[in-house]
Amino acid sequence: MQKNGVQLWLKKSLEDPLVKILAKNSHLTKTQLETLLIDVLAENIAGKPLKYDEKARLRLTKAKISRGAFNRTLRQAQENVIKAIYTVLLLGYLGIFESTALDKYIEISNKL
């Protein structure tokens, strides 16, 4: 799949109504989410390994993104995801998930 195919897939994914709602309420910026998707899934979509400068060119922005800027945004996204996972682990360890306060969120996550 060519660059246009990957970008079309990326744009379609980011415009999904459920993705928009979840992303809006997450700790990831739109740019971080886009960068993370490119890093994790673009090689599968492209059908070949990609270098980071190639991944940087897949961003949807018209401005040229350097490999360094791509990697910096990717690192920020990864740190935010890791912190979110640690937050979930902490709340689980402290028994917060057993509280009824989070029931509606747990129910929603089970329906996804």
Region roles according to the model:
Residues 22-30, 64, 68, 99:
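Short, solvent-exposed segments of well-ordered alpha helices
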Residues 44-66:
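Helix-turn-helix DNA-binding module
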Residues 86-112:
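Intrinsically disordered, low-complexity basic tails/linkers immediately adjacent to helix-turn-helix/homeobox/MYB/SANT
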Residues 12-26:
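Short, Lys/Arg-enriched N-terminal segment that forms or immediately precedes the first helix
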Residues 31-41:
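Short alpha-helical "packing" element that flanks the helix-turn-helix/winged-helix DNA-binding module
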Residues 78-85:
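C-terminal flanking helix
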Residues 1-14, 84, 91:
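N-terminal leader segment of winged-helix/HTH proteins
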